[in-house]
Amino acid sequence: MKIVIVNGRGRVGKDLFCEYAHDNRGMVYSISIVDRVKQVALFAGWSGEKDARGRKFLSDLKDAMSEYDDLPRKYVLDWMRQKLDIYEDSMIGTDNIVFLVHAREPKDIKRWVEENGARALLIHRPDVEKSWGNHADDEVENYDYDYYLTNDGSLYDWERKSIDFIDRIRKESWESKI
């Protein structure tokens, strides 16, 4: 089982990367450490729009939830354990599972790497806005990533890059832990 932290500014193609990897390679699962934060934000009146105002709200709420009870991280770890339990109870096993975890902040990425043996991927797209006005989005490049991918071609090119990336890391000898 491998955990890859997926990061990049808004609108660089992270979700599409994860979708392509899942659809073409199987046993690839994507989750964000702000998934539970988004649920709380919707309850609190957030419209669901990821404009600059919405992104700042999510960033601030994530900070508060993390500081209070580490809920964003706990939610992801529990979700992973549930997925692993399904495979451990089957004949398939967990060796080829890849979890793609969306995390923005360097401190969160560092924690996943140190505590769980994750690796970190930065996705870049040359034509994307560089500043969103919140620290979570604006500081994505303040980390020394293990992998870098540039989304600068067609959708087909991006699909190929996602497939090639999954194939590559599955061949590598490192493992993650929960």
Spans of features found by a protein language model:
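Small-molecule kinase domains that catalyze NTP-dependent phosphoryl transfer to phosphate-bearing small molecules
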Residues: 109-115, 119-178
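ATP-dependent small-molecule kinase phosphotransfer cores
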Residues: 32-97
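Post-Walker A helix-loop "phosphate-sensing" segment adjacent to the P-loop in P-loop NTPases
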Residues: 22-30
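Walker A (P-loop) phosphate-binding loop of P-loop NTPases
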Residues: 11
